[in-house]
Amino acid sequence: MALRPEDPSSGFRHGNVVAFIIEKMARHTKGPEFYFENISLSWEEVEDKLRAILEDSEVPSEVKEACTWGSLALGVRFAHRQGQLQNRRVQWLQGFAKLHRSAALVLASNLTELKEQQEMECNEATFQLQLTETSLAEVQRERDMLRWKLFHAELAPPQGQGQATVFPGLATAGGDWTEGAGEQEKEAVAAAGAAGGKGEERYAEAGPAPAEVLQGLGGGFRQPLGAIVAGKLHLCGAEGERSQVSTNSHVCLLWAWVHSLTGASSCPAPYLIHILIPMPFVRLLSHTQYTPFTSKGHRTGSNSDAFQLGGL
C-alpha cells in the first residue's frame, strides 16, 4: 500500500480520503511506483516528471490518471512537510526573539546601572573639583598675601639706615635697667652715683656745646651737624647717670636741649638724643625730625621743633 491512513507524514487527516486516493492509484501499477519513486524529491521535480508523462502520447490514459493521483498524494505530503518545517522555523524565531528580549532587558538593566555609576562618578568628580577650586583659591590668597608681604618688605627701609635710634641700656628715673645693659653701663652708673652732684656740673659744662650746635642748625646747616666720632659714645640720662655704648661705626651726633625748645618745666636736666647715620648714607639724608622726651619718657615734641636738613 502506497499510503497509510495512520501515517501522520502523509498530510491527510481522514482515512476515507486516503482510501479513495489509494483506489485511484491502484488502477495501474505505475501509480504506486510513481509515488514511491518521487517521495524524496521536491515538488518541482515531481511536477516536471508528471508533465512529461502527460505530454507523451504513447502513454496510456490509465497510466496518466494513476500518476496524477500519485502526484496529488505527493503534493499533500510535501505541503505537510513544508508546514512542519515552517512551524519549526517559527518556533526557532520565537525562541530567538525571546532571547533577544531577554538580552535587551539585561542590556537595559546594565545601562541603568552604568548610568547610575556614571552619575555617581560625575558627582564625585564635581565634588573633587569644588574641593580643588577651594584649595586653589586658598593657595592663591596665601600667594597674594606673601607677595604683599614681600612687596612691603622690599619697600621698607633696612633697619639702622637713616632712622633715629634710641640706644638700649639707658637707666630710667626709678633706677631700673633695661634689658641689654652691660657691665660697663652698671659700672658707669655706680661711678655716677658715687660722684653725687657732679652730674649737674657735667651738664653745665656740656651746656654750651648743644647751644652752639642748635645755633648751627638754625643757620641752615652750613656748618657740620656735630662731631663724627668712632669708639665709645657717652649718653647722659635724666638723673645725671651715664651709660656707655660701644660701636665701631661713624655716627653723627645731634645735641639738643629739650627744655629750651619745649619750655617744659618738668625736665630737670637736658637730654641728648643721638641719631645714628652710617657714613655711606650721609649724602642721601634729606629731612630728619627729632622728638624730645621728658624725664618720664613722654613725648613733648611738636611740629615747630623739627629741623630741616639741607643736602650734606
UniProtKB/Swiss-Prot annotation:
<dbReference type="InterPro" id="IPR055047">
    <property type="entry name" value="TEX13B_C"/>
</dbReference>
<dbReference type="InterPro" id="IPR028193">
    <property type="entry name" value="TEX13A-D_N"/>
</dbReference>
<dbReference type="Pfam" id="PF22836">
    <property type="entry name" value="TEX13B_C"/>
</dbReference>
<dbReference type="InterPro" id="IPR054602">
    <property type="entry name" value="TEX13A/B_middle"/>
</dbReference>
<dbReference type="Pfam" id="PF15186">
    <property type="entry name" value="TEX13"/>
</dbReference>
<protein>
    <recommendedName>
        <fullName>Testis-expressed protein 13B</fullName>
    </recommendedName>
</protein>
<comment type="similarity">
    <text>Belongs to the TEX13 family.</text>
</comment>
<dbReference type="Pfam" id="PF22835">
    <property type="entry name" value="TEX13B-like_middle"/>
</dbReference>
<dbReference type="GO" id="GO:0003729">
    <property type="term" value="F:mRNA binding"/>
</dbReference>
